[in-house]
């Protein structure tokens, strides 16, 4: 649907940002498979500065449940290992002198259900964000109507468009959540 009203364009952009934030959050939830994004939030001390691992090392997935972290500078190996141990990943790094192997353990059924619940909670937070965007857009449209920018008919059309945007964003969030739940539960 082509949106011409700036208020609705802004609302659509904010809804897309809520979806992108949800995908980033869900990318950090471990699904029993190796994924380089698991290390996105981890930083290590590198010459006195906290540096993200993906800027200090090549992170590869040689096997479905193994992450390999190969530092560009071998002297940073110990610091990277310390950072991984200090993180909340719950994975013990194996240092072979030139790289670090991280074996992702299989998830228990109980843990899978827990993660699926976390995914649903993140999805719910994203939907709340989308609804807040709709509320802000509706308030701005009503203010525009009050100020004489829109006729009654235009206001109703724009409100319908805002609701359609909200419904679509809700469906998108549901699809993202369903995909992640499937990934977790199938392992």
From Swiss-Prot:
Compartments in which it is found: Cytoplasm
PANTHER family in UniProt: MITOCHONDRIAL RIBOSOME RECYCLING FACTOR PSEUDO 1, RIBOSOME RECYCLING FACTOR
Gene3D superfamilies: 3.30.1360.40, Ribosome-recycling factor
GO MF, one example: ribosomal large subunit binding
Tagged with keyword Cytoplasm: yes
GO biological process, one term: translational termination
GO cellular component: cytoplasm
Tagged with keyword Membrane: no
Alphabetical UniProt keywords: Cytoplasm, Protein biosynthesis
InterPro entries referenced in this protein's UniProt entry, alphabetically: Ribosome_recyc_fac (IPR002661), Ribosome_recyc_fac_dom (IPR023584), RRF_sf (IPR036191)
Family membership: Belongs to the RRF family.
CDD domains: RRF (cd00520)
Function text: Responsible for the release of ribosomes from messenger RNA at the termination of protein biosynthesis. May increase the efficiency of translation by recycling ribosomes from one round of translation to another.
The organism's place on the tree of life at top rank: Bacteria
Pfam (any one): RRF
This protein's name: Ribosome-recycling factor
Subcellular location, principal: cytoplasm
């Amino acid at each position: 649907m082509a949106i011409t009203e700036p208020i609705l364009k802004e609302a659509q952009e904010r809804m897309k940002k809520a979806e992108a934030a949800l995908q980033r959050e869900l990318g950090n939830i471990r699904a029993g498979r190796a994924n380089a994004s698991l290390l996105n939030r981890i930083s290590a001390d590198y010459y006195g500065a906290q540096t993200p691992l993906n800027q200090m090392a090549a992170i590869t997935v040689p096997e479905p449940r193994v992450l390999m972290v190969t530092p560009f500078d071998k002297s940073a190996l110990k610091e990277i290992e310390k950072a991984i141990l200090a993180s909340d990943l719950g994975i013990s790094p194996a240092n072979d002198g030139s790289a670090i192997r991280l074996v992702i353990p299989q998830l228990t059924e109980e843990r899978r259900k827990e993660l699926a619940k976390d995914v649903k909670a993140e999805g719910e937070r994203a939907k709340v964000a989308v609804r807040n965007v709709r509320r802000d857009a509706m308030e701005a449209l009503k203010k525009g109507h009050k100020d004489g920018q829109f006729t009654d008919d235009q206001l109703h059309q724009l409100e319908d468009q805002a609701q359609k945007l909200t419904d679509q964003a809700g469906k998108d969030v549901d699809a993202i959540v369903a995909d992640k739940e499937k990934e977790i539960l199938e392992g």
